[in-house]
Amino acid sequence: MSVNVKDFGAIGDGIADDSPAIQKALDSGSTIVEIPEGNYRIVTTLKVSSFTRIEAAKNARIFSCGDTPKHQGDLLLTNSDFERGNTQISICGGIWDGNNTGKFNTKNPDLFAPDAWSGTVLNFFNVANLVLEDFVIANSVVYYARFGKINNFVIHNIGFQSDFPGFNQDGLHFSGYCRNGLIENVSALTKGQTNDDMLALNADDSMERLENRGLLRGPIENLTFRNVFAEDCYTAIRMLSVTAPIRNIRFENIRCGCRNYAINMDAARYCRTPLFDAKDYPKGVGDISNIVIDGMEVWKTSERDVPLIVNETNSENIIVRNFRRVMERDKCPEVPTIVTQNTIPLATSFRNELFQ
């Protein structure tokens, strides 16, 4: 059974507040909710229940109103039940727009302000059998999409675009208890995006920061990423572990120009909000294991003097195959490709040459 949001009063003119009408459609009990072409201004967070599929037209733009103040918990769209969880939520199509030029769509300079909103466009927490496909996430204030406690999920054919760079503009941000997922065909559509980690696997993080409230520290495991492209992102991949494990992760066909890192495993040592005091961990931190990176082409797009791969995390069984640094495109060829420090001996196998 399908319904159309316009049958519930949605206008799609970019002026009317369409959030009540779209929410009525989502709450109607229909398994498919259709959003036709148009510009849908969203004032209050859209909440999606279990057994719901949103089918949005390719040019349906669903955007966050910039004229209303934002508070903790405000998002463009999220699942409905964080406590008991949701299952079988699908979103296909559309442009999901954080509208980062809106008057009130800004990041609070106080990272710990009690009522500050996260600045995230799409949020999924405690969801099983999630499918996200064939859409664009645009103009995020902070994260484009964030995930916590999700299991058995598929994300494919997702693009990121933004007219302006933003602080901590992660692409797909995974926190604790994300398990058993396939993520494929992910592209930055705008040069310069994403303006932070394109793929962030943060098993540990500062959960007191406004971006991360409501997420959890915990294991991240059994994920496959393939076909990831960015012309000029900040960092392609971050794996952040202090005590929580990241394990059984596979990356295939990653092709990214990077201003900062291609792979960042620095355990957030240099972050504004560090997660530990190094003096308390004389043998280092981290628990990363069974990582395969097969088919990666990267190049530096800035002259920043940092390696493409930085490892300062205890880890084992990291296998890198078919890695190529594209020197003819590299703006800082003199910097090392990889630096490892502050760890116990690392079991890493590099297969094929780093430089081709």
Segments the model singles out, each with a brief description of its role:
Residues 1-356:
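Extracellular/periplasmic carbohydrate-active domains that bind, remodel
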